[in-house]
């Protein structure tokens, strides 16, 4: 089964001694600890098909190739924001045999001849922005990863309670597994409501 994969990353608060001290004694920015949760979502099933927890200093582009290796299914498109517009990310997508739907950064230059990214850069230079390219190639589906991250935070609390990093990784995978079970039971159906009378 081929699927489209969308990527996102967002912070999870680690609730431990540092948070308790902030609550008890007032704000002190040094004590707060965050972890970044990087996820990949299948746009047809809304299932989180890959996840990785990293330190707050790690960028999404550094984690992306490992996250892509976790997926065992055939993928035809990979969407992500401009942070994934790196050579390593595009190389990982090409190895997987997928098309990259990653907007180039503003003022991006062309890469080597016949690179798939050059089409996107050409659209940006021709139209002055990425708007036309985003509409043409369905970049809006990337919002499904934002929705999945929202579900993680709303349904499962969006914070980690364990202090050990390895235990936090296990806690995160348990959260993702639970969320995928809930998603498998069914997603709410949404429809647009016209408020005009």
Where are these regions (language model features)?
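Polybasic low-complexity intrinsically disordered regions
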Residues: 1-99, 104-106, 110-112, 173-176, ...
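Detector for Asparagine
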Residues: 8, 66, 118, 130, ...
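Alpha-helical structural elements
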Residues: 10, 15, 20, 29, ...
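Intrinsically disordered and other compositionally biased segments
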Residues: 25, 61, 122-124, 185
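Intrinsic disorder/low-complexity detector
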Residues: 44, 87, 117-120, 168, ...
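Helix-centered, glycine/charged polyanion-binding patches within enzymatic domains
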Residues: 82, 87-154, 162
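Basic, amphipathic alpha-helical segments enriched in Lys/Arg and hydrophobic/aromatic residues
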Residues: 130-197
